[in-house]
Amino acid sequence: KLVADGIRAGALGFSTSRTINHRTVAGAFTPTLGAAELELMDIAQAVNKIGSGWLQVISDFDNPKEEMDLLQRLATTSGRPMTITVLQRNDRPELWRDTMADIAKANLDGSKIVGQVLTRPTGVMLGFQISLNPFMACGAWREIEDLSHKEKVKFLKDSAFKKRLLTEPQGEHLMRTRVMEWDRIFPLGDPPEYEPLPETSIAFQS
């Protein structure tokens, strides 16, 4: 009912996130991450009854076939166009090709699915004044993370403390491996460089 009312009031459609990259301010996953098919089907049926609007889905495609089959069922049930975010993943660089092929096949079967490609890669800001940095899962960092930035800098300049950051084992954190991919971490620069060359990475410079 909420979706139907929203579209009648002028909304373009219904968008849902199925990616771990979207979180609440507190860092928790969005409730839509593991939404059941029954819930999504109810929404697709509501959109179908209105006969207007789009569906948008942002997915990690961790189980590509299962996910694509689900999305095709949703698109078919809604009878409306669906847009799916398509991007290249570091761990599976060819997955986007498979996704586009699956979209083409689904459309041959009668669906109306469009791959939506980002104009540039999605990045994540890392720093000592924000929530993510390469040492966030290290015990040494957790000792100072609640201090003011000025106080943190004092510790970061201390050689003994820096050694701890570089040598202590990292604890558990969902983003731990991602924020330590040194060959894919780059200084932002001033002005910002959004398409950095490989030789400007932290790994290359070190």
PLM-predicted stretches and their roles:
Residues K1-A46, V57-S206:
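Active-site neighborhoods of metal-dependent hydrolases
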